[in-house]
């Protein structure tokens, strides 16, 4: 753990906090992974402690999969154009996740992994509304992305689409070149997205139960 003396300027800006965050960002690439104002979600010293110790923390995990992405790449008129469409969509994914307090784990080649750190078990319902907003936003914009792929394809498959799978539970934050997550919820979300139809979202049992309870209220 890094010890830094408290240092705040007259305007109230915490130089200490900013310096600590900058050091941590350099270590694990937070500019790629963290949402804006991530320090409000988890203090920098707590994030560093979790990465160093390997202690588990409660996390919601969302895995997205672009159906038929390998086929789309193979049938592309221009590989460069395919890469540009995918890159632009991944930027939209990161930006939308950040606006909904989600962390970008990685681009998987045919999809992505996003997560929300809720912490202790009693806070497990936290971020459900943000996850729903994120999912709705992506499913709303993906038809436009599909049209971009279609205009660049010599043979566009009918079952192209975006599928989402969501699981929740204890994960470990690790530094493998930069910040990554590992744990059963990653596996669970991956299994659910594999079963989801194009433009379908599959949730784990606990999240599905909370959603049903909200509908009944």
Per-region residue spans from a language model:
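Extended catalytic cores and adjacent scaffolds of nucleotide/polyanion-binding enzymes
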Residues: 182-183, 187, 201, 205
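Catalytic core of nucleotidyl cyclases, primarily class III adenylyl/guanylyl cyclases
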Residues: 99-127, 145-184
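Acidic, glycine-rich loop-and-strand cores that form catalytic or ligand-binding grooves
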Residues: 129, 133-138
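Substrate-engagement module of ASCE P-loop NTPases
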Residues: 88-95, 137-142, 190-194
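Regulatory cytosolic signal-relay segments
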Residues: 1-57
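Cytosolic regulatory/linker segments at or just downstream of nucleotide-handling modules
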Residues: 199-217
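Catalytic NTP-binding/metal-coordinating core of nucleotidyl cyclase/transferase enzymes
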Residues: 47-130
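Alpha-helix/helix-capping structural signal
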Residues: 67, 169-171, 187, 206
